[in-house]
A protein has these predicted regions:
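Short helix-loop-beta-strand segments that form the rim/entrance of peptidase-like active sites
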Residues: 17-61
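Surface-exposed loop and adjacent secondary-structure segments within mature catalytic domains
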Residues: 42-167, 215, 302, 324, ...
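Metallocarboxypeptidase
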Residues: 44-54, 60, 66-67, 148-408, ...
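Short amphipathic, basic-aromatic surface patches that mediate peripheral association
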Residues: 419-434
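Short proline/glycine- and polar residue-rich coil/turn motifs
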Residues: 460-469
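Short, hydrophobic beta-strand segments
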Residues: 473-481
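Short, aromatic- and glycine-rich surface loops/edge beta-strands on solvent-exposed regions
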Residues: 483-492
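Edge beta-strands of extracellular beta-sandwich domains
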Residues: 495-505
């Protein structure tokens, strides 16, 4: 049966992703809804709630907010030692947050919008100037603070397909991490997977390929992505759907480029014309702020396996008050003050650091900014479950809608079969044809020894069947009236179906 792949817990501090995956499991196992029952019968859900479980355990049970990494020991600073300089809880509040310290040569100044924040220093800023660090000490006495955390290889930069050794966190080679390799082997062994969602946080953004400037999407696939993205925005109520490469984070932009979908202030969704003069491939404009992500899941699943791959950045903390397409940290602070009772940002407090002297410790806590607090968890999960179910409904699904018989005399019949794809997604994405990896829809007849198939081509092939589309195939057979013939149709991503008929005049 056609399948969708769901994974969470790829980034260890994004624990809402695991909860959302489990929310889907719960819905599928407990719902009596007729639509859910139909999905259980006609589709397959492969759900991996937590790709890096030891990372999320670190998040839940220690003071650390782990980075996007496996916990395989890694020498970040190339000093021959592994994971020797992590952040620490210095002030005993059971959190490892941030530190800021006055420094005449510092690169930061207090933000005039809100002095709890720092911004980059400009040439004419009068000071005082600051440096900022994660909370902790210089454990290895190399002059750097907390530069060698646990682990260091990012599984979402370790995928084959657009992998680069220069990408931070890429690892020694594509698929080097055991957790990711196990997932890749499973996906490779299950060619019925035609769609995926990789669950992440935060930002309230629906992401799609490409993640790098070298990759171009065929227009047919881009149109499909845009249509499903718009539906996803309506379901999740998020503000932006974009390619990873165009998502101008962290510096931000209005996110109003070609192929992006953005929710306007009045709630309507505006789509930017993605097509470049009717070309066969979508061409985006390179930009110095673009967020290239080599070795990411979306490009790997899409290009290597022909999977319509989305990543959902679950949860957005704060409101876009100036309608510039992003939620700034000053807007988040205002939201925390007015809506969250200041539960998410810890005020800066003085501390005597054993190496830096007088510092301030404070900043964003683990929960609230990147993951919703408990009162907001259920609503966030349910909206994302609906998005995943919507994508599952869109999977290609083959059926035999009609069989016509034409008697030609002398016990010869022409059988004409209409094959329907009732899913929104085609049986093959356009990228599969570009890469010469496409698999046709195959149909053939099963007959008894009393029936003979007269066609030279016993198996009929159709390159692809578009979403909500249909195609016809026909055979000539010889057999007596009442003989049974079974028509079989198969595509790895569209499923298998058959229909038995009796020859009749």
């Amino acid at each position: 049966k056609p399948a969708i792949w769901i994974d969470g817990g790829v980034d260890s501090d994004e624990v809402i992703s695991t909860e959302a995956a489990l929310g889907l499991v719960h819905r599928l196992l407990t719902s009596n809804d007729k639509d859910i029952d139909n999905l259980r019968k006609t589709r397959v859900f492969y759900i991996l709630p937590n790709l890096i479980p030891d990372g999320s355990e670190l998040h839940h049970h220690t003071v650390l907010r782990p980075r996007d990494s496996t916990l395989k020991p890694w020498d970040d600073d190339n000093d021959g030692k592994f994971d020797e300089d992590p952040p620490e809880d210095l002030d005993g509040d059971n959190m490892a947050l941030q530190m800021r310290v006055e420094d005449p040569s510092g690169d930061w100044v207090k933000d005039e919008k809100d002095e709890r924040l720092l911004r980059r220093r400009k040439p004419d800023d009068p000071g005082p100037y600051y440096e900022r660090y994660s909370e902790g000490i210089d454990n290895d006495d190399d002059g750097d603070y907390n530069e060698d955390w646990p682990g260091g290889i990012d599984p979402n930069r370790n995928y084959p397909g657009n992998w680069s050794v220069k990408q931070r966190g890429a690892g020694a080679f594509p698929g080097s991490e055991n957790e990711l390799r196990s997932a890749l082997d499973f996906i490779y062994d299950h060619p019925n997977i035609s769609a995926s969602q990789s669950l992440h946080s935060t930002g309230g953004v629906i992401l799609r390929p490409p993640s790098v400037p070298e990759m171009k999407l065929p227009n047919a696939d881009l149109s499909l992505y845009i249509a499903l993205s718009e539906r996803g925005l309506n379901i999740t109520r998020y503000g932006l759907a974009t390619s990873v490469y165009q998502w101008n984070w962290p510096r931000g932009s209005k996110n109003s480029g070609k192929g992006q979908l953005r929710r306007l202030e009045n709630g309507t969704i505006k789509g930017m014309d993605p097509f470049d003069g009717g070309a066969n491939h979508y061409g985006h404009l390179d930009h110095e702020d673009a967020y290239a992500a080599y070795g990411g899941a979306l490009d790997g699943l899409y290009e290597l396996f022909g999977v319509l791959a989305f990543a959902n950045e679950i949860y957005r903390f704060g409101e876009d008050l100036d309608n510039d397409g992003r939620v700034s940290q000053s807007e988040q602070l205002k939201y925390d003050d007015e809506q969250m009772d200041s539960k998410v940002f810890k005020a800066w407090t003085p501390f005597d650091h054993p190496q830096l002297g007088k510092v301030e410790i404070g900043g964003w806590k683990k929960f609230g900014q990147n993951n919703p607090l408990p009162p907001y968890l259920e609503d966030e999960i349910e909206r994302n479950v609906e998005f995943m179910l919507m994508q599952a409904r869109a999977l290609p699904l083959l059926s035999i809608s009609d069989v016509k018989q034409e008697y030609l005399g002398k016990n010869i019949y022409r059988l004409t079969t209409t094959i329907l794809n009732s899913g929104f997604q085609p049986t093959e994405l356009a990228i599969r044809f570009v890469n010469n990896k496409s698999v046709p829809v195959r149909s053939y007849l099963s007959v008894s020894n009393k029936v003979m198939v007269l066609d030279d081509e016993k198996e009929k092939e159709i390159d692809k069947i578009n979403g909500n589309g249909k195609e016809e195939v026909s055979w000539l057979v010889h057999g007596s009236k009442g003989s049974k013939v079974t028509i079989n149709v198969y595509h790895p991503k569209g499923g298998r179906t058959s229909k038995e008929i009796k020859l009749s005049r």
